Design a protein with these regions (language model features):
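Structural recognition of the beta-strand scaffold that forms the well-ordered cores
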Residues: 1-3, 18, 43-48, 78, ...
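Flexible loop/hinge segments that line or gate small-molecule binding clefts
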Residues: 1-25, 36, 43, 139-147, ...
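Loop/turn elements at helix/coil->beta-strand transitions in domains of secreted/extracellular proteins
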Residues: 13-15, 39-43, 70-76, 101-105, ...
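Hydrophobic alpha-helical segments within soluble ligand-binding/sensing domains
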Residues: 18-44, 88-90, 114, 138-142, ...
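Short, solvent-exposed amphipathic alpha-helices that sit
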Residues: 26-30, 54-74, 88-92, 116-120
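Short beta-strand elements in bilobed, periplasmic/extracellular small-molecule ligand-binding domains
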Residues: 43-46, 67-86, 185
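Hinge/cleft segment of the Venus flytrap/periplasmic-binding protein
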Residues: 47, 51, 66, 70, ...
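Hydrophobic alpha-helical
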Residues: 63, 77-144
Length: 200
């Protein structure tokens, strides 16, 4: 399978292995970026992906693991589902800022929700950089958001599964054996490399 694990206990005779990113590690790296960009202080809101999805659970678990272990003054004031959808990210962010205008950090489980958070920030008079947004995926829009100043960091979720998947199939058919799990590497986009990476 690619990008998603099998999620039930039913035996599958044709299952070979899995290729994808380590979603827990993505969350950990997002937390490290948040701590770095925030200076370890402030009010944080989390835009959660869809409930019951392993990516959502893993990205949140990794993030909270690092944040809770670190000696920071970052306060999580809200965790609300926005289902990986830009429009829901916008609606949820509007609600969160209405309830607490002092929110100055946002962790979004994906780029679409992060980009949806930008219009409400503008509507509340925020300037680029006033609210630190850390997100995961690595879409062009989010990397451009770093250049524009609205996004502080992006952890990539590498979409280039093809070569690894083909290597696994070739190994299977030649009898060389296939690993049960193949983790692909994910980049990190920051203010230091965003322009160069977007040009690639």
């Amino acid at each position: 399978t690619i990008d998603r694990f099998l999620t039930n206990d039913t035996h599958c005779d044709t299952y070979i292995g899995w290729v994808g990113s380590d979603f827990v590690e993505q969350g950990r790296r997002a937390a490290e970026a948040m701590i770095r960009e925030s200076g370890g202080e402030g009010k944080l809101a989390i835009l959660l992906g869809a409930a019951g999805v392993n990516v959502t659970d893993d990205r949140n678990a990794g993030f909270l693991e690092v944040l809770e272990a670190a000696d920071t003054n970052i306060e999580i004031v809200a965790q609300q589902t926005a289902n990986y959808i830009r429009e829901e990210g916008q609606t949820v962010t509007e609600q969160l800022l209405t309830n607490d205008p002092d929110i100055n950090h946002i962790y979004a489980h994906n780029d679409e929700m992060a980009l949806g958070a930008v219009p409400p920030l503008k509507g509340f008079g925020k300037q680029p950089g006033d609210v630190k947004i850390i997100t995961i995926d690595g879409t062009q829009g989010a990397v451009q958001g770093i250049i524009d100043g609205w996004v502080s960091g992006v952890i990539e979720s590498n979409p280039r599964f093809g070569p690894n998947a083909m290597d696994a199939l070739e190994a299977f058919y030649t009898g060389d054996g296939v690993p049960q799990v193949t983790i692909i590497s994910d980049k990190e986009y920051t203010t230091e490399n965003a322009e160069a990476e977007l040009a690639n």
